[in-house]
Amino acid sequence: MKMMALALPLLLTLPVAAQSVPPSGTDPWKALTFLEGTWEAKATGSAGVVAMGTYTFRTELGNHILARHSTNGAGCKGPATFDCDHGDLLYVFQDVPGQPLKAVYFDNEGHVIHYDVSTPDATTALFLSDSSQPGPQFRLLYELKGATMSGKFQMRMPGQSDWKSYLEWSGAKRPQN
């Protein structure tokens, strides 16, 4: 159940493809601009979890990172072991100019996930953790289809080839004030 709590805001806020390496001297965030803004999210997951919330992607720290902040709404339902007050942050950054983007996820339960970031197409962002680390491998996918952002937080256990969705979500972009 703690893993569900780990994943909920990750999906509320908030895949394997070739790494997108931005040419040196270009805007590293150009391929991810479709993520920017505040998005509504209705998430469903294993063990009967249903949650509503929002997440915002925006550049911060002088345009050096792309940050995702999430909030849970009042409509969270799940088993007693599920943390409806979960909080997390996702930071996307370019470690070395001209190299693929990286991301790091933190939450209030002490989980940390490091991701490689790629953009298989103009409306898809794929966050993939290192499969050589102990434990499950994680995949976070954002896809913009029309005016709806959808996504999945998935896990693959060591020795397995199939990804299992832990949470899935979708929602529209909120109008800017």
What are these regions (language model features)?
Residues 5-15:
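Bacterial N-terminal signal peptides
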Residues 19-177:
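Hydrophobic small-molecule pocket/channel-lining residues, especially in calycin-type beta-barrels
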